[in-house]
C-alpha cells in the first residue's frame, strides 16, 4: 500500500472508461478535467475551481458546467457520422438535433446551438409549447431545423407553422392520428405549407429502463395501418409532398447495439415502403437512444453501453444506406436526437462532506462470571475467532443470532442497557475481525465479504439533496460516477456510503463505480480531521436539473461555468446563485412577508429587550436570504 499512486486510483474509479478522455487524476491526487479535445494539455483542477468560488463567497454544493465539453461532444458526434458517411459512400447528409428536454438551461442550449455554425446542421427539438417557444427564439440562422414532437394542441401547431415564417425549417411530427387534421386545419387557416413528419411505432424495442418507448405498446407513434391511413388522407388532398420526415424512437440509453441494429433495419423497411407508395420522405430521424457509459463497463447494463460513438454512427449510416442501395432509393438526410450523449459529461456536482461515522474496534473485556449465558456464548465465539482455523461463516451466523436474542431479552427486561451495549460492541468487533480474515477469492466467502463491506462502511454525510441533484439515482437506480476530488494519491483504505442532508432514509447513494463493476460502497482515502473532503458526482448534465424536486425545500444549487481562456487557464464565468430560503418558501406559497410579520408580533413580547428583539429579527433576515444548504460560519 505504500507504493500507491494516482494511477491506482484511476483504475479503482474506472475513470478512463467513463470519463471519455475528459477527466483524470494528477500526480498530486487531484481530479482534473481537460474540457477541450483540441487542447488536450490544458487541464483544470476541479478543487481549484471550488476554492476560487469559495473566495468569491459561494459555498458548496455547486454545479460546475464545462461548456468546452459540450462543444467537444458536438464535434465528436459530427466526426463519427462524418467518418461513417465517408467510409460507407452514403450520399446523404447528417443533422444533429438536440432535444432540449434533456437540459433546458439557456446556456446549455446556446452553447450547443453555437458550437457548429459553419452551416445549419445542428437543430433543436421541442416536446411541448414552452419548449417550442424557447427553441424558436434560440435559433438565429436561416434554415435552422426544429423538430416538434410530443402531444400537440392547435396553439402548439400554430407556433410550429409560424416558425416557418421566421425562416426556420420546422417539422411537425404526427404522433397520434388526430394530430394530422389539426395540422391540416391550422396550416390552411394560416396559409402556410406544413412540413409533416410521422413517428412509426416499431415492433423493435430497446432493452433497459426506457424500453416502453418502443414496441407496439409505446405511448407515442402510429401503427402500420395508421400510417397507411395518414398517407391516403394526404394523397386525397394532394398534399402527399408535405410528408417529408420519418421518425422512430426506441427509448433513451440503449445499452445493446443489437437493439439499435434491429430498430434501424425496421425503420429502413418503413422508409422503403413509404417511398414505394410515392411519399417523398427525404429525412429519417432515428431519435435518441445513444447510450452513455456511466459505469465504464462497456456492457449491456442499464447504465452502460456495449458500443462506442463511432460504432453507433456506423450502424445507423450503414443500416439506412443498405436499404437505399438495395431498392435504389435516394439517400435521406439522417437526424439523430442524441441529447444525453451531448450533455451528460459537461456537468459535475461538487459538494463537501460535513461529517462521517466510522466503525472502529471497541476496547471490550470478558463478561463477568455471573453474566447471562447468552453473553458468555458471544464471548466464546470471539475467542474461537482468534483461535486456530476458525469457522468464519459459522462464527458470524452465531454472532448475528446471539445479537438478535440479546435484543429480544433486552426488550423483555431480562438484560440491562449496559449488557445490550456490550453485546453490540462485541458483535461489531467480530464483524471487523471477520472482514479482515475473509478471502473474497474464496467463493464461499464472497457473499459475506460483500455484506460486511457494506455493513461496516463509513456513513459519510454530504451537503446536498439526492432528490434535487441526482433524482435518477433515487428514482430508477441510475449509476453516476462518484469520487473524492483530492487525496487520491493515497491508498483507498476506507469504504463509505454517501448520505444526503434530507430527512429521508432514501437519501443515500446506493451504487458506486468500482473498477470494472458497481459496488454498494465507495472506496475512499483516509482524511485528516481538519482536512476538507470534496466529492464530485460526474456525468450529471442530462435530465438531473429539470427532474430535481424540492424535498425538505432544498432547491437549486449554485452553478458556474468553468472555461479555458486563450492561454489555457481556468476562467470562471456566468455564476448563478442557488435558491435562497426566501425563494423556496415562495415556491410552496409560503409568503416570507407573513413570516416577518409573525416574527415581529411574537418578539414584541415585553419579556424581550430591544437588543434581543433586533438580534432575533436580524437572524430571521439572514436565514431568509441565505442558501438552503449548510453553510460555513
UniProtKB/Swiss-Prot annotation:
One of its GO terms (biological process) is putrescine biosynthetic process from arginine. InterPro entries: Ala_racemase/Decarboxylase_C, Arg_decarb_HB, Arg_decarbox_C, Arg_decrbxlase, De-COase2_CS, De-COase2_N, Orn/DAP/Arg_de-COase, PLP-binding_barrel. Substrate binds at residues 284-294. The modification N6-(pyridoxal phosphate)lysine is found at residue 101. The keyword Membrane does not apply. Belongs to the Orn/Lys/Arg decarboxylase class-II family. SpeA subfamily. This is Biosynthetic arginine decarboxylase. Its EC number is 4.1.1.19. One of its GO terms (molecular function) is arginine decarboxylase activity. Keywords: Decarboxylase, Lyase, Magnesium, Metal-binding, Polyamine biosynthesis, Pyridoxal phosphate, Spermidine biosynthesis. It is an enzyme of class 4 (lyase). It catalyses: L-arginine + H(+) = agmatine + CO2. It comes from Aeromonas salmonicida (strain A449). The keyword Lyase applies. Pathway: Amine and polyamine biosynthesis; agmatine biosynthesis; agmatine from L-arginine: step 1/1. Catalyzes the biosynthesis of agmatine from arginine. Its cofactor is Mg(2+); pyridoxal 5'-phosphate.
Amino acid at each position: 500500500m505504500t507504493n500507491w499512486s494516482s494511477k491506482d486510483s484511476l483504475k479503482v474509479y474506472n475513470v478512463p472508461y467513463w470519463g471519455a478522455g475528459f477527466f483524470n487524476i494528477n500526480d498530486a491526487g487531484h481530479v482534473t478535467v481537460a474540457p477541450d479535445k483540441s487542447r488536450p494539455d490544458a487541464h483544470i483542477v476541479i478543487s481549484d475551481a471550488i476554492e476560487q468560488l469559495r473566495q468569491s463567497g459561494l459555498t458548496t454544493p455547486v454545479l460546475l458546467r464545462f461548456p468546452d465539453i459540450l462543444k467537444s461532444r458536438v464535434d465528436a458526434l459530427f466526426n463519427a457520422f462524418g467518418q461513417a458517411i465517408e467510409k460507407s459512400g452514403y450520399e446523404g447528409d447528417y443533422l444533429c438535433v438536440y432535444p432540449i428536454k434533456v437540459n433546458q438551461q439557456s446556456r446549455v442550449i446556446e452553447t450547443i446551438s453555437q458550437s457548429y455554425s459553419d452551416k445549419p446542421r445542428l437543430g433543436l427539438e421541442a416536446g411541448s409549447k414552452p419548449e417550442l417557444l424557447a427553441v424558436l427564439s434560440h435559433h438565429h440562422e436561416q434554415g435552422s431545423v426544429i423538430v416538434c414532437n410530443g402531444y400537440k394542441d392547435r396553439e402548439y401547431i400554430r407556433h410550429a407553422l409560424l416558425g416557418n415564417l421566421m425562416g426556420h425549417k420546422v417539422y411537425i411530427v404526427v404522433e397520434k392520428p388526430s394530430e394530422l387534421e389539426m395540422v391540416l386545419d391550422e396550416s390552411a387557416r394560416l396559409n402556410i405549407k406544413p412540413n409533416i413528419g410521422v413517428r412509426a411505432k416499431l415492433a423493435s424495442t430497446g432493452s433497459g429502463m426506457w424500453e416502453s418507448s418502443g414496441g407496439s405498446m409505446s405511448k407515442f407513434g402510429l401503427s402500420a395501418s395508421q400510417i397507411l391511413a395518414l398517407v391516403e388522407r394526404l394523397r386525397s388532398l394532394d398534399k402527399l409532398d408535405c410528408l417529408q420526415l420519418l421518425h422512430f424512437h426506441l427509448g433513451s440509453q440503449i445499452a445493446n447495439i443489437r437493439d439499435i441494429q434491429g430498430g434501424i433495419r425496421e425503420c429502413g423497411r418503413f422508409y422503403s415502403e413509404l417511398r414505394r407508395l410515392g411519399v417523398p420522405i427525404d429525412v429519417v430521424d432515428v431519435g435518441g437512444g445513444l447510450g452513455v457509459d456511466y459505469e465504464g463497463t462497456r456492457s449491456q447494463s442499464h447504465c452502460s453501453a456495449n458500443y462506442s460513438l463511432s460504432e453507433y454512427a456506423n450502424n445507423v449510416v450503414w443500416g439506412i444506406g443498405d436499404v437505399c442501395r438495395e431498392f435504389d432509393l435516394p439517400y435521406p438526410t439522417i437526424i439523430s436526437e442524441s441529447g444525453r450523449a451531448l450533455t451528460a459529461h459537461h456537468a459535475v456536482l461538487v459538494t463537501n462532506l460535513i461529517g462521517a461515522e466510522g466503525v472502529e474496534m471497541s476496547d471490550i473485556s470478558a463478561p463477568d462470571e455471573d453474566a447471562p449465558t447468552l453473553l458468555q456464548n458471544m464471548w466464546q465465539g470471539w475467542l474461537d475467532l482468534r483461535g486456530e482455523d476458525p469457522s468464519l461463516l459459522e462464527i458470524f451466523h452465531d454472532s448475528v443470532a446471539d445479537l438478535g436474542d440479546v435484543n429480544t431479552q433486552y426488550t423483555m427486561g431480562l438484560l440491562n442497557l449496559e449488557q445490550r451495549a456490550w453485546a453490540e460492541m462485541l458483535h461489531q468487533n467480530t464483524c471487523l475481525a471477520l472482514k479482515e480474515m475473509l478471502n473474497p477469492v474464496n467463493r464461499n466467502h464472497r457473499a459475506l465479504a460483500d455484506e460486511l463491506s457494506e455493513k461496516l462502511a463509513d456513513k459519510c454525510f454530504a451537503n446536498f439533496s439526492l432528490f434535487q441533484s441526482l433524482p435518477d439515482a433515487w428514482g430508477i437506480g441510475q449509476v453516476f460516477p462518484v469520487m473524492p476530488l483530492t487525496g487520491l494519491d493515497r491508498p483507498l483504505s476506507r469504504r463509505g456510503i454517501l448520505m444526503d442532508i434530507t430527512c429521508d432514509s432514501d437519501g443515500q447513494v446506493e451504487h458506486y463505480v468500482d473498477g470494472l463493476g458497481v459496488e454498494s460502497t465507495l472506496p475512499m482515502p483516509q482524511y485528516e480531521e481538519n482536512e476538507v473532503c470534496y466529492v464530485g458526482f460526474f456525468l450529471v448534465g442530462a435530465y438531473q436539473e429539470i427532474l430535481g424536486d424540492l424535498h425538505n425545500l432544498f432547491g437549486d444549487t449554485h452553478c458556474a461555468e468553468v472555461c479555458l481562456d486563450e492561454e489555457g487557464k481556468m476562467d470562471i464565468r456566468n455564476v448563478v446563485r442557488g435558491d435562497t430560503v426566501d425563494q423556496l418558501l415562495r415556491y410552496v406559497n409560503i409568503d416570507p412577508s407573513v413570516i416577518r410579520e409573525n416574527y415581529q408580533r411574537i418578539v414584541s413580547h415585553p419579556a424581550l429587550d430591544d437588543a434581543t428583539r433586533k438580534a432575533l429579527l436580524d437572524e430571521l433576515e439572514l436565514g431568509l436570504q441565505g442558501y438552503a444548504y449548510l453553510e460555513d460560519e
